[in-house]
A protein has these predicted regions:
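Short, acidic/polar N-cap/turn motifs at the starts of alpha helices
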Residues: 1-3, 40, 98
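Extreme N-terminal, non-catalytic leader segments
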Residues: 1-9, 14, 46, 129-135, ...
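Glycine-rich phosphate-binding P-loop
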Residues: 8-29
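Conserved nucleotide-sensing/catalytic segment adjacent to the nucleotide-binding pocket
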Residues: 30, 34-88
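Conserved NTP phosphate-binding and transfer environment spanning the P-loop NTPase/kinase superfamily
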Residues: 77-139
Length: 139
């Protein structure tokens, strides 16, 4: 998984190779997010909170397809606020129920989006805001 931080909230980006994890991370970073870890993220639980950490061997490195591996500053450890699974368009529900995933006993909001969509960075930010402020409308 790749992880970025947006306003102190860790966002895990998961998906198969080529699903757009690093690309979406790059677009989020270009919009003000910070890099935590690209391609591999260590997870741990402390006081009931899930944390994402960067392995030292890849600290500050981001793979940019077509450019190469670039050195960036990074945030080495953040609390995880949400998980985004990057899936095929056919696997994205139009009006999904709110979902959570339990990792090491901690429940985390989970969303499924197409990572290569132009709107993917906006969807990540919107979902974080809606989750944090309880803005979801029940269908």
């Amino acid at each position: 998984a790749t992880c970025v931080v947006i306003k102190g909230h860790g966002v895990l980006l998961r998906g198969a190779s080529g699903s757009g994890k690093s690309d979406l991370a790059l677009r989020l970073i270009d919009g003000g997010a910070g890099l935590v870890a690209d391609d591999y993220t260590e997870l741990s639980v402390e006081d009931g909170q899930l944390f994402a950490c960067v392995p030292q061997t890849i600290q500050g490195l981001l793979e940019v397809r077509g450019i190469g591996i670039v050195h960036l500053g990074c945030v080495p450890r953040v609390p995880v606020a949400a998980i985004f699974d990057l899936v095929a368009l056919s696997d994205v529900e139009r009006l999904p129920e709110q979902q959570v995933e339990t990792i090491e006993g901690v429940s985390v909001a989970r969303f499924a989006i197409r990572g290569l969509d132009a709107s993917a960075p906006a969807k990540v930010r919107m979902a974080l805001k809606a989750h944090a402020e309880n803005l979801f409308h029940s269908t």
